[in-house]
Amino acid sequence: MRLPLLLLCTLLLSGCAARDQLPDFSASVGHDLPATHFQAVIYGRDGTRLSATVFQPALKAGATAPVVVHTHGWGGWRVTRPNSFYGTQMMSGRAALKAWQAGFWVISYDQRGWGGSAGNIEMMNPDYEVQDALAVIDWAAAHLPRLSMDGPNDPRVGMLGESYGGAVQLLASAEDRRIDAIVPIATWFDLAEAMAPDSHLKVGWTGVLLGLGLSTGYDLGKFVQAPYLKS
């Protein structure tokens, strides 16, 4: 019984695995682009391997579209496919799929240390998570066809995500002018105040966040270090 179950899980997970090889877009030149999605590997600026799902919109021949970068919350993962948990049960995942269906490119990626991405969780460190988000934009500009561009290596970009995924938008948009719009949902400005407003600890939420962090082996001591308390 265990062997068939293991094989089934392996097959299901293989369908969500990111891969380096991209679809051949050359055949679509001068033709309509069909709506589809595929898994991809994007490398952060420090070489960290990030797993991503790219949702390709239906586009008429010659038409272009902006890209929406979707970032998940603490303890979450990317939208791996249209009927995935994050795509059907989480507000930001549903919004990302709505954007895709409305004709936008969408890239949903696992932030470092979460899901299928390598690296360690650095709690929104500008040198790591923020640079990863900018690397996703670099990748989109270099690899996606029919992308609306505002200039060389400057795609028209929006960002969407909740909580932890909202914080990266605030920091990334302050650093990179290529980001044209952000939708940070239920994120924080001052993490200490968010977790313990007026020194009253939110026991429920803090317990959930700490539990999710422990499950990854994350160094929870960073939660109380000054550089990590404010975005």
List each language-model region with its residue ranges.
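C-terminal motif of bacterial Sec signal peptides marking the signal peptidase cleavage site
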Residues: 13-15
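Bacterial signal peptide processing site
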Residues: 17-19
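N-terminal cap/lid segment of alpha/beta-hydrolase-fold proteins
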Residues: 24-63
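Loop/turn elements at helix/coil->beta-strand transitions in domains of secreted/extracellular proteins
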Residues: 49, 63-67, 102-105, 153-156, ...
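Gly/Ser-rich "nucleophile elbow"/oxyanion-hole loop immediately N-terminal to the catalytic nucleophile
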Residues: 59-63, 122-128, 135-163
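Short substrate-entry loop that stabilizes the transition state in hydrolases
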Residues: 61-65, 71-102, 107, 112-118
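Glycine-rich His-Gly loop
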Residues: 70-76, 163, 187
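Accessory cap/linker subdomain of secreted extracellular hydrolases
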Residues: 89-92, 101, 160, 171-231
